[in-house]
């Protein structure tokens, strides 16, 4: 199944002291570059990649993919980035992932997409936790998401609860780098390039 990947790099990164998370380096490369490498290594790579970002747009654009700022004011969260992606690719099946999704099984996209028929959304979970921001979505959900955001909804979990949704278990632990300390800890284990 062909798909468009949407990388979320538009957050405020408040738990990282406000630095632009996608540009934080891990072993000499920004997280966005590592995530793009993880996508390129997929057994089923995307046809197109979009990057949701609200700062340093030129730095993200240098990676050669369309950069989409939020269309809603006041940084309303990752769902605003998702809405911008849906509006930019209205007929595409989307694979949404945060800019710290740099360690993915090579069949990650293929497995999520294979589970999508009969569902509106399929998200991922690993042995430690559910990852609602790692998900595949059917096209045609932009109006439902816009209505949820207009009603004041901001939570990915809350929006997923309104949809036909399934969570797919992944045996490999997926990174969740919400602090600079977590990035540094992963860097200690990172193999040399």
PLM ranges: what are they?
Residues 1-175, 180-183, 190-193:
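Nucleotide and nucleotide-moiety/phosphate-recognizing core
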